[in-house]
Amino acid sequence: LQQKAFAYLHQSALDEYKEILKAQKDGVKFTGVSGSILQYLYLIAISGEQVPAANKAAYTYYLSKVGELLTSPSMDTKAIAAIVLDKAGRKKEAQEFVASLKEHLTKTDEQGMFFAFNENPYTWGGMQMQAHVDVMEALEQTGGNTDTVEEMKLWLLKQKQTQQWNSPVATADAVFALLMKGANLLDNQGDVRIVIANEVLETVSPSKTTVP
């Protein structure tokens, strides 16, 4: 099934490449790559899929254009581009994307690290949760960002506490991110103490209980 899926993706990417070459002959200029092609490159990067001989020229062309996405306002686009470049051995270019992503992060003691955009999240790269998780994956895959990833996990947990993860997809994304390498925050339950009128409701973590 995977082979059939990749066969379809390879053919689609090749067809798009041929259309680009045709348009370029007519003077049309292209910047970056389309969203579908970026996803195609990402799947190759994370799966280790071998690029067919017929697609080599197309793949090389697409890869050469990924760096032009550095000016994109979309955080998840930059995150995916960083992974693609890193896996392709273009470490320096990948780190430029990582640096750009980090520049947009905000940090607070309570919330950890997150993107504090005031605009509608759709204007800066899709659903906020998805973009946050995509960036976490990029930082994890490119290495050397353990502390930042852990801080970003904290924001995910705070979202669950304050407003819930807003869809099954968001929930899956969040759980995937929380189970990345590093501290498993899902195991760290902690204690909760709530006072309602004169009544105290309190949970106690297992580490604080004693066996008689």
Protein language model features and the residues they cover:
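Large, well-folded core regions of big proteins
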Residues: 1-212
